[in-house]
């Protein structure tokens, strides 16, 4: 398929490279055209343009000026841009798209915004797909887990794209009783979750769960990190803090990095996030290069809001969100563990 890619940063470049490796033709546009040219020279994209209008033209036709009449076929356009720029990017793209085109939003948009956008575009004859995308900077090698929302026809048209981006069936053992049965998209690492907004809704909850898991790791490693507090204990301490009953019980000088490495093998708490945590702790056991305050990008808040709207208890996710708020005041080691993980899986600037 011929695809137009808007946004060629960490995620966009990796996605483009996977698509090209699978035989697709990817033409890109980014604000930094010089960088886009460099990506073209490295064959990370099939071509680059200096404008959104030019991108639409090249996706639809290899010659001539695009009009409603001379468009050869509907175009597929992927937006991999920050949530706060989706609306402006979409508005610019809509100036040049034609009826039948498909626009895929791979960002972390609020699912309510995705529903609104899909309804708006449907009145123009343009199909909108919201695609929650997980995988971060490792997606190029591991593949991207995709949570898709939109009309059946649009999703079916774009299935070759999703198949190319997803990790594939070999990424995990098949669950019980599936051997020999028909293979489904979710076994390849992508799912058509439902109508417009469903993809971003599922991705929102995914990120809420991520908050909770990361917080549990951070708190556990913080306890290990402080396990030698008894050796530093001063009996005449703060009158507002309950005294430690048996300081001698907490005189363990535990190497947190080595514990993380051990837990990666055979432990029930093993995971990819633990792998990343072990990696960052091995490099800097005290995480001295990481800030103590942890950002929240929005999805955790949206998940808590949805839980309140639905009347569904979510104490772990809520607590993890509150902890991120508090971390920006305290700068504790637990917050540095969280930032270490975020830097590893998402390439976030947390120093």
Locate predicted features:
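Helical "substrate-binding/catalytic lid" subdomain
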Residues: 143, 147, 157, 164, ...
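Beta-loop-alpha module in the N-terminal Rossmann-like domain of NAD(P)-dependent dehydrogenases
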Residues: 79-93, 110-113
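Rossmann-fold NAD(P)-binding glycine/threonine-rich loop
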Residues: 102, 106-155
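Hydrophobic beta-strand scaffold residues
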Residues: 26, 47-48, 103, 128-129, ...
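NAD(P)+-binding Rossmann beta1-loop-alpha1 motif at the extreme N-terminus of oxidoreductases
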Residues: 1-63, 67-76, 96, 100, ...
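Short, well-ordered coil/turn residues at beta-beta hairpins
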Residues: 80-81, 106, 164
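Conserved dinucleotide-binding and phosphotransfer motif residues
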Residues: 22, 124, 310
């Amino acid at each position: 398929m011929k695809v137009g890619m808007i946004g060629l940063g960490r995620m966009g470049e990796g996605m483009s490279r996977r698509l090209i490796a699978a035989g697709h033709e990817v033409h890109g546009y980014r604000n930094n055209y010089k960088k886009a040219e460099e990506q073209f020279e490295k064959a990370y994209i099939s071509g680059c343009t200096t404008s959104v209008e030019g991108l639409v033209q090249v996706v639809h036709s290899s010659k001539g000026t695009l009009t409603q009449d001379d468009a050869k076929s509907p175009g597929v356009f992927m937006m991999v841009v920050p949530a706060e720029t989706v609306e402006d990017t979409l508005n610019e793209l809509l100036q040049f798209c034609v009826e039948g085109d498909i626009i895929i939003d791979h960002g972390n948009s609020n699912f309510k915004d995705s529903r609104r956008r899909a309804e708006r575009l449907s009145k123009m004859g343009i199909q909108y797909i919201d695609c929650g995308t997980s995988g971060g900077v490792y997606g190029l090698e591991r593949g991207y887990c995709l949570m898709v929302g939109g009309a059946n026809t649009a999703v079916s048209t774009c299935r070759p794209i999703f198949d190319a981006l997803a990790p594939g069936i070999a990424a995990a053992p098949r669950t019980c009783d599936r051997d020999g049965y028909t293979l489904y998209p979710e076994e390849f690492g992508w799912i058509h979750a439902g109508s417009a907004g469903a993809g971003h809704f599922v991705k929102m909850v995914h990120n809420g769960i991520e908050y909770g898991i990361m917080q549990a790791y951070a708190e556990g490693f913080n306890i290990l990190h402080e396990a030698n507090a008894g050796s530093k204990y001063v009996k005449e301490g703060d009158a507002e803090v309950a005294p430690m009953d048996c300081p001698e019980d907490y005189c363990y000088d535990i190497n947190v990095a080595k514990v993380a490495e051990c837990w990666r093998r055979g432990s029930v708490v093993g995971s990819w996030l633990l792998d990343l945590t072990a990696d960052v702790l091995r490099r800097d056991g005290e995480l001295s290069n990481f800030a103590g305050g942890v950002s929240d990008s929005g999805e955790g808040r949206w998940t808590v809001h949805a839980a309140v709207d639905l009347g569904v208890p979510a104490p772990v996710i809520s607590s993890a969100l509150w902890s991120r708020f508090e971390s920006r005041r305290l700068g504790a080691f637990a917050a540095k563990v969280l930032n270490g993980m975020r830097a590893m899986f998402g390439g976030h600037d947390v120093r």
